[in-house]
Amino acid sequence: MFQHTTVLLKEAVDGLNVRPDGVYVDCTLGGGGHSEYLLSRLSKRGKLFAFDQDETAILHASERLARYREQVQFINRNFRFLQEELSALGIHAVDGILFDLGVSSPQLDEPERGFSYQHDAPLDMRMDRKQRLTAAEIVNRWPYEELVRIFFRYGEEKFSKQVARKIEEVRRKRPIETTGELVEVIKAAIPAPARRSGGHPAKRIFQALRIAVNDELEAFREALEQAIELLAPGGRVSVITFHSLEDRICKETFKKASESPPLPPGLPVLPDDYRPVLKIITKKPVVPSAEELERNNRARSAKLRIAEKQ
């Protein structure tokens, strides 16, 4: 069953200042929780475009949102194609855009998807199952230097070199084909004292592989730039991140867009080109309440940032 506990539901959607007849985009449909709440705030004239590159997510969410079928349109593509897809539909400005960058719990919990170090399954990790690159391809074919780079950059794993070296050693004898096999390789590479602290020893490596397989950070960077461009004046963007790499991209993009470029001296009036594009609404990120964390432990690392188009 495709069930997913939505994180920061009201905070993210209410933060968009929803207008009943507005046009909105949910860039990360997932289980459909944010979309459902947003649609409940729209009139019959309102419209929601919901993106997800996972066909299964769209299938299940379309059932959940069946009563809103006149107001919602599903788009089965990565959100990095936000502008391209909306432009093809004749949409060039919107009133609000939402990103929830967490991996859907069902994707984590379906063993055959290969996202989780808790289950033994084929090394896959593709959000879009039509794409060719898998985690197995990276683990078995990418050179040592590339493995070190992604483990360190995307997983912030301090034992990146040791893990990459151990992978190289093992794959010379036989391919590493399952998540269980990879977990054993990681455990063998990380010193025992480090394995006993800081959560599961495979957590950071699995995060790094998932990000690399799906090109998550670059896709998000591109999509967020497009989202800012698409917003109508007064429109807002809500972004929920789950780790420091995504949060840094969001924070830096918002900061850059909310600053005026350096002004030439002696200008009597501030030209439009020199006005900030965004106003940051959340000076500090919004985090889940104690009550929400009690209901959903997976929300513990969530941060919400909101900005408004000037």
From Swiss-Prot:
One annotated GO molecular function: rRNA (cytosine-N4-)-methyltransferase activity
Top-rank EC class of the record's enzyme: transferase
Enzyme Commission designation: 2.1.1.199
Keyword Transcription attributed: no
Catalytic reaction(s) noted: cytidine(1402) in 16S rRNA + S-adenosyl-L-methionine = N(4)-methylcytidine(1402) in 16S rRNA + S-adenosyl-L-homocysteine + H(+)
Entries under SUPFAM superfamilies matching the protein: Putative methyltransferase TM0872, insert domain, S-adenosyl-L-methionine-dependent methyltransferases
Known role: Specifically methylates the N4 position of cytidine in position 1402 (C1402) of 16S rRNA.
Record-linked HAMAP family: 16SrRNA_methyltr_H
Name recorded for this polypeptide: Ribosomal RNA small subunit methyltransferase H
Organism expressing this protein natively: Geobacillus thermodenitrificans (strain NG80-2)
UniProt lineage: Bacteria, Bacillati, Bacillota, Bacilli, Bacillales
Gene: rsmH
